[in-house]
């Protein structure tokens, strides 16, 4: 079967309440009340990465705070505060947050990122309980390793070959490769679906090629 869909893009700053409010109003006017919120804002900061030159005890507070602001405030708190109450008022909605394998197992070097993503997973479960009786489901997706601009320097050498860190990831991933962004779509569609996932809340779907299942 074929269906006709309409897609529109709206820009906003996920760390600015006023910008989120304006975006919400624009979406309401153009497309109607949103029933799905996918919080995809997130990232890391070079001043929050442990290196030989900058050990843990030297991490500057601004670098640490910027990672938590982006991943927890912009990637969860403010968007949920803006869009969630309206969903609760209508009695239905699906909120999907982006966690990380670092939510489950902290990785070397990226301490602030790991800690902030662990907080996203915890906050997801908290909010799922708060809004369960209001018809709003709150879940998360844990992506494995997917190359993106924020991690490209860690995963690839200057000549484009996999870095030692990438090789270590492959060795710890039963499927032996990076994920493709398209492979996250199924999990998102499932969690967004009121029909398929109507009794699913407070859950985390892991899409990692088996990374978290590998020990020795």
Located regions from the model:
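A glycine/serine/threonine-rich, flexible loop-to-helix segment
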Residues: 51-54, 133, 145-172, 214-216
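Alpha-helical segment proximal to the catalytic Tyr-Lys
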Residues: 85, 129-133, 198
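Residue(s) in the substrate-gating loop at a strand-loop-helix junction
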Residues: 100
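Short C-terminal tail/terminal secondary-structure segment
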Residues: 105, 189, 195-216
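The beta1-alpha1 cofactor-binding region of Rossmann-like NAD(H)/NADP(H)-dependent oxidoreductases
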Residues: 11-23, 61, 182-183
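Active-site helix of classical SDR
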Residues: 80, 116, 124
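Active-site Tyr-X3-Lys motif and surrounding loop/helix of classical short-chain dehydrogenase/reductase
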Residues: 22-29, 48-58, 62-70
């Amino acid at each position: 079967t074929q269906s006709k869909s309409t897609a529109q893009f709206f820009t906003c700053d996920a760390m600015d309440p006023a910008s989120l409010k304006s975006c919400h109003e624009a979406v309401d006017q153009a497309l109607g009340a949103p029933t799905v919120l996918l919080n995809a804002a997130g990232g890391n900061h070079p001043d929050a990465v442990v290196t030989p030159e900058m050990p843990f005890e030297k991490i500057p507070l601004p670098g640490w705070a910027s990672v938590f602001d982006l991943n927890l405030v912009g990637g969860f708190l403010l968007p949920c505060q803006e869009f969630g109450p309206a969903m609760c008022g209508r009695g239905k909605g699906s909120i999907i947050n982006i966690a990380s394998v670092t939510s489950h197992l902290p990785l070397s070097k990226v301490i602030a990122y790991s800690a902030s993503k662990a907080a996203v997973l915890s906050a997801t479960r908290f909010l799922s309980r708060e809004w369960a009786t209001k018809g709003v489901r709150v879940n998360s997706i844990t992506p494995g390793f997917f190359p993106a601009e924020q991690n490209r320097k860690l995963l690839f050498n200057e000549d484009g070959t996999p870095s030692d860190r990438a090789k270590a990831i492959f060795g710890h991933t039963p499927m032996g490769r990076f994920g493709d962004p398209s492979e996250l779509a199924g999990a998102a569609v499932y969690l967004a679906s009121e029909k398929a996932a109507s009794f699913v809340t407070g859950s985390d779907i892991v899409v990692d090629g088996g990374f978290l299942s590998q020990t020795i």
